[in-house]
């Protein structure tokens, strides 16, 4: 467990306060015996994640108002766009020129995995954020940045975590390298172009 966090061995409650941010694992092992005296032991490993959005000096809230369905979307990637016209946003306030200090958080403080599709400090940047729960038109997520101690992007930015909820592949066609379009999931299902390309209007961009 992180420093300052303890587990009550009698009831399993986790309690305490810590300044350590990040993910850690711990294993709980329980042993007991039945009426015949047979001893049984079981173990389970847990992952605990601690985040601190308040460590970032710059934040912008985004309300996901475009979904009007009646069901709740779980672990759903949503598109967030940045540009200089957003109130409270400036590329110059980032501690990393490549947005290594960018983080996203749910309303409950959970850190959300994301993928940068394009990062353009002179124009519009496009980021896909995997939101744990999207319900109605008032789900709020927070973008945070500017912490000079967190300028290295987390692994989830690059490892396909954004698209891990059953997606077979995810392609951003403007990121074509020659004739190759890379798959953003961890499945590595890259595309090779055959013939010429034609740009058309899509559900999200062209």
Show which residues each predicted segment covers.
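Short, solvent-exposed loop/turn segments at the edges of extracellular beta-sandwich modules
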Residues: 31-39
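Boundary/junction segments of secreted and surface-exposed precursor proteins
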Residues: 52-74
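Interdomain boundary/hinge segments at the C-termini of tandem beta-sandwich modules
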Residues: 46-52
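Surface-exposed beta-strand/loop patches in extracellular or lumenal glycoproteins
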Residues: 70-95
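A surface-exposed beta-strand-loop module
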Residues: 111-141, 149
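Extracellular and select intracellular beta-sandwich modules with Ser/Thr-enriched
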Residues: 38-46
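Strand-loop-strand motifs at the edges of beta-sheets in extracellular beta-sandwich domains
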Residues: 2-19, 27, 123-126
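Extracytoplasmic low-complexity segments
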Residues: 149-206
């Amino acid at each position: 467990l992180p420093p300052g966090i303890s587990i009550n061995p009698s009831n399993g409650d986790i309690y305490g306060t810590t300044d350590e941010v990040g993910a850690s694992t711990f294993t709980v092992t329980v042993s007991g015996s039945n009426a015949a005296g047979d001893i049984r032991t079981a173990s389970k490993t847990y992952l605990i994640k601690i985040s601190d959005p308040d460590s970032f000096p710059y934040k912008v809230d985004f309300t996901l108002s475009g979904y009007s369905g009646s069901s709740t979307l779980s672990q759903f990637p949503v598109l967030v766009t940045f540009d200089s016209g957003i109130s409270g946003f400036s590329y110059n306030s980032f501690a990393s020129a490549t947005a290594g200090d960018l983080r996203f958080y749910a309303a409950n403080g959970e850190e959300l995995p994301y993928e940068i599709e394009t990062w353009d400090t002179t124009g519009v940047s496009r980021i896909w954020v995997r939101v744990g729960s999207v319900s109605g038109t008032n789900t709020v997520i927070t973008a945070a940045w500017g912490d000079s101690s967190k300028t290295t992007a987390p692994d989830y930015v690059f490892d396909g975590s954004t698209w891990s909820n059953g997606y077979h592949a995810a392609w951003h066609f403007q990121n074509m390298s020659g004739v190759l379009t890379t798959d953003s999931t961890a499945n590595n299902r890259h595309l090779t172009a055959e013939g010429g390309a034609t740009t058309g209007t899509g559900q999200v961009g062209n």
